[in-house]
Amino acid sequence: HFGSSVASYFIFLRWMYGINMILFGLTFGLVMVPEALMGKPYGSLPRKTVPRAEEATAMNFATLWDFSGFAQYSVLFYGYYNNQRTIGWLKFRMPLSYFLVGVGTIGYSFMIVIRTMARNANEDGGGDDTSFNFSWKMFTSWDYLIGNPETADNKFASITTSFKEAIVEEQESRKEENIHLTRFLRVLANFLALCTLAGSGYLIFFVVRRSQKFALEGLENYGWWERNEVNMVMSLLGMFCPTLFDVISSLENYHPRIALRWQLGRIFALFLGNLYTFIIALMDEINLKASVLFLFTIFNRHMCKDEDFQQLEEEKIVKYNMTIWEASLYNGTIPENSTAPPIQVDPADVPRGPCWETMVGQEFVRLTVSDTMTTYITILIGDFLRAVFVRFFNYCWCWDLEYGFPSYSEFDISGNVLGLIFNQGMIWMGSFYAPCLPAINVFRLHTSMYLQCWAVMCCNVPQERVFKASRSNNFYMAMLLFILFLSTLPAVYTIVSIPPSFDCGPFSGKTRMFEVISETLEHDFPSWFGKVFGYASNPGLILPFILLMVLSIYYLNATSKSYKEANLELKKKLQSVRSR
């Protein structure tokens, strides 16, 4: 009913659902379940216990909806996991498993996306034979084995839509246009699109600066909108800017398939700017959380000298002040060069440093949930209620609502595709800090499939100019691969460069997260294996190997192009022989 272009979106969504099922299986089976079954239970450690000051509101709906309270101190987030090398009677290596699953999900995603692109390119390599196109459709489209009336109606609609697509292709190939007017309108459209992108970027920058000011003054002093302003503004921009780009693209007079790619590119730039502005804001918030460590030094600061105080690192300051705090519980005093005796304290009463990894995971989960809710509300209001209004008020209105304003809505291919791609980018980027993200995304994709199918069939009308989509979804896959690469960079940066929080997460106590690999090689493998691994990871071997891979890719690409050219030549010869 709606053509191959709309069908390509749902095929892409189904493919994404399969990928996320694998990611969910890895994180759920190798990270969340082992920690829940074999790890220390809730309340045994400070990192697994809600602080005393938050216990009263830990089960409130508003707190849980914000993924704080008991949700924050659970297997859903990074900070809950303990740093023991082995847990349970199976001696399950939780830190190693957490690290390998985080790296493995990214590696698997790269492998499956590139493999799918290669398979699609291979299937599409023969090109499209347009000889006697309408004759082939007329005499070979019907399936004479159909015996069900509903199936026959669907097949009839499919054949009709394929004829419409072929007519559009034929019209576009014969179209004549005023080249000077077309160039002027396309330059104007690009200028308006750039102004829209710049305005959205400035708006996000302004909102991020406001959120940092709110964080410094204390978010508890502000309302719901101020606490969620960044997420809501990003969701609203993602909802309204694609519509504005769609209006701008009507000036350009491109082929519908090319217009869709321009639309995708503009929305891609919009979402990319939004995503990286959000990441920069998170990095600033991480630095802000790190500076909070110094607040621990206010208590009993007079107990250490100024020169000693300046020499202490941030984490040592927190640990030192915890020792002072434990001694002060019993009105005891300790010298500066000694440690406090072990004191039995309830984990809920122990002060703890900020866990920036959990904070990052919470932000990604909130953004994913708010984006999902915005999408569903948009479908409900923009599609369903609009269709109900047009359907029942058309009889008593001053003009024809079906063919005038507002009319029935069309399915927004570009906005939905880009929303799907960037949501997946957030899943890849945030799943290392929130193992629950793949599960949330599986639920989102599952409900979106049925909700959007229902909205398309019941509330939307086919596009005014139905066009034939490419037989391969490689344009979607290329954007997905680019987003995967960009989503990998922040995660790799935090793993390699930023020290993990010292009192939460499976890597606490280590200088860098990747040290879990060297620790495993040292304790669980013979010494010769560690030496071999060290030699294999030497840059002197890695760089030539990468160079060899690049040269191999260049050679295979050149060979593929030559095969395609030979294939086209053979097709031309076959056509010339057939015409004789």
Q: How should each PLM-predicted stretch be described?
A:
Residues 1-580:
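Transmembrane transport/permeation module of multi-pass membrane proteins
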